[in-house]
């Protein structure tokens, strides 16, 4: 009887895993598909209202925000998913580590903004970069929640949150662009997206950080997360180094045209990667 019961348990677990995987693929495809469709639709309207120079100005800052985002998360989202049964202390440790690292990086980049503007010969980058860099600082408050949702395979909720963030941010960007805000409309679009994303994560997870700060769990995860961190930074630099070089030596209109062409070219690949990665 014990053997039969054990076999039954294994079969039940296998069926449950298959069901979760199927649902994960479905909602992953829904998430990636809706993201692509919305970005295309809103992107067409925005492209008619904004100039290549506007996209170029924002494109220059992309490599800074992405590298800062990689350093901020440090692969801990995947590390949390990799833990068999993460505790509340694990999530809390990752939360405070991300917030402190992000705050440090934001302060450094805030005071580096004039140097960035001088390097690219774009005075507007001083104030613009300080605002755009808020996006990765705000993002740090939702990384632990994102890990929680991925670990618990809350794929439906992830899709809903992402959809609401996309709608909200694109509508704001479109309204601002229509009213002549130029590159500021793209900057606000980024910040609003992260803000709504975090609000949704807090709403669906119900998890809240506490002030019992212990970085012990982070140290245990570091061996796993640092490998992802290095890989992500290498990918980020290789994918955005040309935009960085163009921004320094070429007219800003050319930077914008290249940045937009690259973004549209990578949409198909990101659809597949995001669909599988959400499982």
Predicted segments, located by residue:
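Interhelical loop/hinge segments that connect adjacent transmembrane helices in multipass membrane
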Residues: 8-17, 21, 156, 199-244, ...
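Membrane-interface junctions at transmembrane-helix termini in multi-pass inner-membrane proteins
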Residues: 18, 22, 79-88, 138-161, ...
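Membrane-water interface segments that mark the loop-to-transmembrane alpha-helix transition
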Residues: 19-39, 60-61, 66-114, 127-133, ...
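Residue-level signature of transmembrane alpha-helical cores of multipass secondary-active transporters
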Residues: 24-32, 62, 98, 131-132, ...
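Interfacial/gating helices of multi-pass transporter permease domains
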Residues: 42-69, 124-127, 220-224, 228, ...
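Helix-loop interface residues and adjacent transmembrane-helix termini in multi-pass membrane transporters
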Residues: 49-52, 88, 119-122, 152, ...
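Helix-loop junctions and terminal segments of transmembrane helices
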Residues: 70-88, 150-151, 261, 265-279
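Hydrophobic alpha-helical transmembrane segments
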Residues: 126-133, 161-206, 220-224, 231, ...
